[in-house]
Swiss-Prot record:
Name recorded for this polypeptide: Flagellar brake protein YcgR 2
The protein's assembly and partners: Monomer. Interacts with the flagellar basal bodies.
Organism annotation: Dechloromonas aromatica (strain RCB)
Coiled coil (residue ranges): none
Keywords assigned by UniProt, alphabetized: Bacterial flagellum, c-di-GMP, Nucleotide-binding
Single GO cellular component term: bacterial-type flagellum basal body
UniProt-annotated location(s): Bacterial flagellum basal body
Keyword Nucleotide-binding: yes
Cited function: Acts as a flagellar brake, regulating swimming and swarming in a bis-(3'-5') cyclic diguanylic acid (c-di-GMP)-dependent manner. Binds 1 c-di-GMP dimer per subunit. Increasing levels of c-di-GMP lead to decreased motility.
Amino acid sequence: MTQIAQLSEAEIEARFRVMGTKPVAFLIAGFAKEREPFSVHFGAGGEMFLTTPLAVEPEKGLLIFDCSGSVESNQRFLRSDRNIFIGRPGGVHVQFTTGAAREVAHEGGKAFAVALPQYIVRLQRREYFRVETPRVNPLEFFGRLADGSLLKLPVHDISISGLGVDAAVLPEGVMPGVVLPNCHFSLPGDGKDMFFSATIRNTLELERRSGARHWRIGMQFNDLSSGDETRIQRYIARIERERHELS
């Protein structure tokens, strides 16, 4: 299953939003008709399961969708008050957020129901597709701050326009708008470093399931070559293919 990193609020531009009760209901009803698969992320993003929209009840403002195959996961999901749905119908990144779910009966079986989201984000531009990098032997990002101090951080997600890195604590001097010159990293099996400058776009403090807190730092490539963009695209395609084979 393709794993696309969740977009931060700062990265979601208004022009990509589909808003209004009728347009939102119409779009999701289409996903239900085609049985488009989605992943639903909950528990502060620490848990997820695969689901399929089953029906939309516009008069009640409800979305009905499949339960997980795990009783324990379903119980934890029902305690979540913020859930993020991510899918790629027709190759287009689709994402929306809902509130808490409740269990309902649907066509003789159990299902979940949530209030329809206020809006849906649809991103078709290739530079907005981000993929989470493998957690085993992660990519390592190298950069330098203005004072010359070295940054060496594991990469959480990557696209042809930028990447996200994780840090146990926010490094001194790291803030949105700061430009990092002479950055580089190497893709697994590639053996050739990519060199570029990067602009920090956002920083976000997150909490793991264990309760430990860490930082996610989003960066934009400034001068990546077209050849390096192609190498990143191939890397993303390989990750998606391998994950699909394992699903």
